[in-house]
Structure formats: C-alpha cells, structure tokens
Amino acid sequence: MDLNTILIILGIIALIILVVHGLWANRREKSQYFKSANTFTRDSRLREPPAHIQSASEEKKDANTSTPTAEVSPAQRTFAFEAEKQFAHEQQAVEQAIENIKITLPKEEQPYQAKIEPDTPPTSPALTTIAEVENYANQEEGIDTHSEQLRQQLADLAQQSPSVTLAALQEEQALMESQAQQQASEDVRQDTDATFIMMYVVAPENYQFQGARLAKILDELGFLFGEHNIYHRHSDLSVNSPVLFSVANIEQPGTFDYNMHDFSTVGIALFMQLPSEGNDLMNLRMMIRAAKSIAEDLGGFVLTDQQAIFDDQAEKAYLDKVR
C-alpha cells in the first residue's frame, strides 16, 4: 500500500477518535448541569438551575433546616441560561467543524499510453510545384483550382520560393551516386597501379642479425630511421625528400627499435612502391645492390618475394617488371 494512503487512513482514524472524545466530554459536562438529557428543553433550562446550584441549595438546607425553601434568584437563572447558551454554541461549533472536514484521497495515476503516430514527412511549399499543388488539392480537398484568384496566389507562391520537383531530386541523387562510383573506381585504379617490389635478406638458420651491426650498415648505405619506425632510403639523403625504397623487420610488428643495441631479428624486408620517385629501373637496381651489401656484411642470404634464392635469373625477372 502506498505510504500516502496509510498516512491518510491513520489521520482519519485519529480525527474520528478526537471527535468521539469531544462528544463524550460534552455529554459528561452536560450531565453536570442537567438532571436528565432526554427531558432537556429550553423551558426546563430556564426553570431549573444547574446541578451544582441545586447541590449548593441542598447543602444550605441541611445546614439550616429551619430556614424555608429558597427560591431561585434571577441571578442564578441568568447564570444557568448563559451556561446552557455557551454549551449549545460549543456543540454547534463542533458539528460545524465536523461538516467542514473534507478528506480527499490521491487519485491513482493513469498508466501512460504512448501514442504511436505514423512518420509522415513534413510538407513544405518550397518542394512542390503549382501542378502538384493543384493535383493534391483536387484529390484530397476538392478545391476548385480553376479559380483565377487561386491560380494567381499559387503563381506568386512559386515565384517567392523556388520549387524543387521530385524529378529534379532524383536527377541530383543519380548524379551524386555517379560521382561516388567514379571516385571509388579511381581509388581502386590507384590501388591497383600502386604495386610493390619486395625482397628479403635473412640470417642463416639458428642465427640472428644483431641490431647494432644492422644499424651501422643501413647508415652507411644512406638509410634513415623515420616514419612507421622503419628505415627509408630517400632520393637526396634528407627526410624531407621523397622515399625511393624502405627496409622493415620481417618479425612482427615489422618495426625497429630506436635503441638498436638491444635489437635482433632473423631477417629484413626491402620493398619499393611503383611508380617510385625518378627512374624506377635505377631505383630498383639501387635496392638490389643494397640487399646484396647487407647480406654480404651480415653473412645472410637474399631471397625473392617467393622466398627463393635471389640469383641472376631472379634479378633479371625483377628488372623486367619495371622496364
């Protein structure tokens, strides 16, 4: 049960108890002033004094039995009338207070019901032509679009805001799709044209190239440690010049450590992207000479991209790719 409802019920019970106690107290007070509540009338209230006055009279009679019975004085009658008037006024105030008590229980909240409305695209006068407005008016509202005044208003509206027909929107969308497809085709063509020529220099079995010696040889051949943490051979030995070919580590993740003294690898990969800066044939010959120099100095072997021994026949096949 809700806490508010429990508090309201407890308040009602407490209020009823207070009202009953008040009525009981009033009746008790009433019995002190009157002999009988059932025979109590306005005339009897005026004729008979209250109980405490009668008891006082009786005590006086007992004290002085020889004294004749004393009659009720006008002052005593006035006191009794005022007491009864006050009691009636208090009882009327209690009854009026009970009638004015109004207790309202909180209304139960109705469950929220979401109204699902169909999604309808907003209509805009700028997206319709005069003919479309006339067609819509004839079909939906039954408006007489042959009226000269209405046609003039439609013409003024069309001049104030440019109209875009559905056919124009479809044509623009088709043009955008065509441009996107053309751009995608160019990107694919560029990726296809950008081929790589690769060869490997590997250490003998159960051996590795030490980083310090490898770095020294690469420096002597003009390689510079740079982008992607690999070595690059630039056209004029400057990091700002175009890259001719590069050297990467064949072990994952394919990079070299900046501190090559603690580095070792089983082999390296030399690769050149075609077309390259300048003459592709000259750049390829330079890369082949660099691979042979590294293998000779480190005691390794030069392999093709198919991991075959790079001999004279393989060299001729490589050079034929760029001729």
Curated annotation (Swiss-Prot):
Protein name, UniProt field = Cell division protein ZipA
Which family does the record assign? Belongs to the ZipA family.
Q: Where in the cell is it found?
A: Cell inner membrane
Query: What job does the chain carry out?
Result: Essential cell division protein that stabilizes the FtsZ protofilaments by cross-linking them and that serves as a cytoplasmic membrane anchor for the Z ring. Also required for the recruitment to the septal ring of downstream cell division proteins.
- Signal peptide residue numbers: none
- Span-the-membrane segments of this chain are 5-25
Gene3D superfamilies hit by this protein: ZipA, C-terminal FtsZ-binding domain
UniProt keywords, alphabetically: Cell cycle, Cell division, Cell inner membrane, Cell membrane, Membrane, Transmembrane, Transmembrane helix
Question: Which residue stretches, if any, does this entry annotate as coiled coil?
Answer: none
